[in-house]
Amino acid sequence: MRLPILIINFKAYREAAGKRAVELAKAAEKVAKELGVSIAVAPNHLELALVAASVDIPVYAQGVDVEKAGAYTAHVALENLREAGAVGVILNHSEAPLKLNDLAKYVEGGKAMGLDVVVCAPDPLTSLAAAALGPHAVAVEPPELIGTGRAVSKYKPETVVKTVELVSAHFPNVAVITGAGIESGEDVEAALRLGTRGVLLASAAVKAKDPYQKIMELAKPLVAAGPP
């Protein structure tokens, strides 16, 4: 995982369905190349292989619910993700929470397969517990702010700061990123100033009238943040 990073979660938005997922990913790819920054996209499972085959930037899966491929109807296994072209996976998003034992298995399994592993958590202490599992990054996202336009970096900066302090002190090799309500370049800049190494966002980019321009705005603060 190249840091700092902007991760765009397509969720199941109609604006990022089918060919629109590729168009959105290509807009992100264009910005990444023009600015020289790290941008990853997380399309819906249905579009994952299509997007992965269409762009050169990192493509992450939005989640997983089976460790190994096999007779699991309507499930998605870690092996399936890798075969589809994913290079990373987001785990334990508040919209797709996991039991601790499953989360631990998926973190270990994902890393063993060479996937970037990002674990979401709602608060500093849970983020610390998630970091103990050894992912590449934890994304602290207060669920009450997700999708509200009220950026965590402005409305709950203490949550971000505490998470950075705890994780950095105990698991310095685990990056802290943040999300929830991120809508603007200013929000991203504020998050980076608080000590994070990136942001995870969705609707700000996916629902933008001009995704390219919006992603450009959101990604520009990464340039100044520079490598670790």
Swiss-Prot record:
EC assignment: 5.3.1.1
UniProt-annotated location(s): Cytoplasm
GO cellular component: cytosol
Gene Ontology molecular functions: triose-phosphate isomerase activity
Pathway: Carbohydrate biosynthesis; gluconeogenesis; Carbohydrate degradation; glycolysis; D-glyceraldehyde 3-phosphate from glycerone phosphate: step 1/1
Keyword presence, Isomerase: yes
Domain of life: Archaea
Catalytic activity line of the entry: D-glyceraldehyde 3-phosphate = dihydroxyacetone phosphate
GO BP terms, alphabetized: gluconeogenesis; glyceraldehyde-3-phosphate biosynthetic process; glycerol catabolic process; glycolytic process
Keyword Isomerase: yes
Keywords per UniProt: Cytoplasm, Gluconeogenesis, Glycolysis, Isomerase
Active site, UniProt feature: 93 (electrophile), 141 (proton acceptor)
PROSITE patterns, per database record: TIM_1, TIM_2
Gene3D superfamilies found in the cross-reference section: Aldolase class I (3.20.20.70)
Positions that bind substrate: 9-11, 146, 181, 202-203
Principal place of residence: cytoplasm
Family: Belongs to the triosephosphate isomerase family.
Subunit structure comment from the entry: Homotetramer; dimer of dimers.
Function: Involved in the gluconeogenesis. Catalyzes stereospecifically the conversion of dihydroxyacetone phosphate (DHAP) to D-glyceraldehyde-3-phosphate (G3P).
NCBIfam families: PRK04302.1, tim
Protein name: Triosephosphate isomerase
